[in-house]
């Protein structure tokens, strides 16, 4: 499997300690610069208010399968958490689009570190992406 980045994040977060635990916990503004060869994929993106950004957490540890989540005392498998430490460190954030200028998007709520490769952008659709209640799910 080969993933090709479509762009790069310009972020105020330089290290993992700078970044919020979740992007929604910060109003910091970041920029997503889409590479020229993918810029046409942004056609009409100015009509959207929110998007899903998938990015590669290139500074995250890839050798952990168990972690202790913040606020907890017991280990859990990484697939039951939102930890950046995981075999394939793919980050996912729903962000608010603040401004679009050619191949650059200014966004809020992105927790990616500066220089993180962007691997995909998708339309956020509340009817599909927002689950109000999951029966039987434990916190």
From Swiss-Prot:
Q: Which UniProt keywords apply?
A: S-adenosyl-L-methionine
Pfam families, A to Z: TrmO_N (PF01980)
> Got any disulfides in this one, which pairs?
none
Record domain TsaA-like: where: 3-133
Top-level lineage group: Archaea
Coiled-coil intervals: none
Q: InterPro entries, from UniProt? A: TrmO-like_N, UPF0066_cons_site, YaeB-like, YaeB-like_sf, YaeB_N_sf
The record's family statement is: Belongs to the tRNA methyltransferase O family.
Assembly notes: Homodimer.
Q: How is this protein named in the record?
A: S-adenosyl-L-methionine-binding protein AF_0241
